[in-house]
């Protein structure tokens, strides 16, 4: 498996895997399939300029996972935040999430970060296992899930 950092000219590749992710796991993201299917080239390019995206692929033609790293507004300068981690269902449990998170961590470290954070929806134990295996630990902070106030998210952190 290889992990690649996407550049602005990879906008079609990002669009393809992101829309696939939304088709497969509609509740996994803070966005919707209808919204992102309507994005134009400029929207995808803007995403690639404003954040760091990585994709995982194996020997086949399709990308098998993705992750995005951002500088969260209001966060410490030495903190980066993981969003949009997704792995194709048939590749889950094979180390793809770990490889993506490790690449995100090494890139964040190279950029001067000392900590990587993320939010996990309560009850998603498979995600919790992947985060723990990648060196993350719950911080104790929780929040209400914006798109569904009946659900909560748990904050995780990994020192780099």
Model-derived segments and their meaning:
Residues 8-90, 98-103, 107, 111, ...:
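Acetyl-CoA-dependent GNAT
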Residues 12, 128-129:
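Alpha-helical elements of the RecA-like P-loop NTPase motor core of helicases
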Residues 1-3:
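Extreme N-terminal starter segment of soluble prokaryotic enzymes
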Residues 77, 95, 126:
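Residues that form or flank phosphate/diphosphate-binding pockets in enzymes
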Residues 114-117, 121-128, 134-160:
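C-terminal "cap" of GNAT-fold acetyltransferases
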Residues 88-90, 94, 122-123:
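Active-site acidic-Proline motif in GNAT/NAT acetyltransferases
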């Amino acid at each position: 498996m290889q992990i690649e950092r996407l550049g602005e000219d990879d906008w079609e590749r990002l669009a393809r895997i992101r829309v696939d992710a939304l088709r497969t796991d509609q509740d996994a993201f803070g966005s919707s399939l209808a919204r992102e299917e309507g994005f134009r080239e400029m929207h995808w390019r803007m995403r690639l300029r404003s954040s760091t995206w990585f994709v995982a692929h194996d020997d086949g033609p399709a990308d098998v996972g993705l992750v995005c790293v951002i500088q969260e507004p209001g966060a410490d300068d030495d903190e980066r935040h993981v969003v949009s981690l997704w792995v194709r269902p048939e590749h889950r449990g094979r180390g793809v999430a770990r490889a993506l998170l490790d690449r995100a961590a090494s890139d964040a470290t190279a950029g001067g970060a000392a900590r990587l954070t993320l939010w996990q929806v309560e009850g998603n134990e498979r995600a919790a296992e992947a985060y723990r295996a990648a060196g993350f630990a719950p911080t104790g902070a929780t929040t209400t899930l914006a798109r569904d106030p009946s659900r909560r998210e748990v904050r995780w952190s990994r020192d780099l």
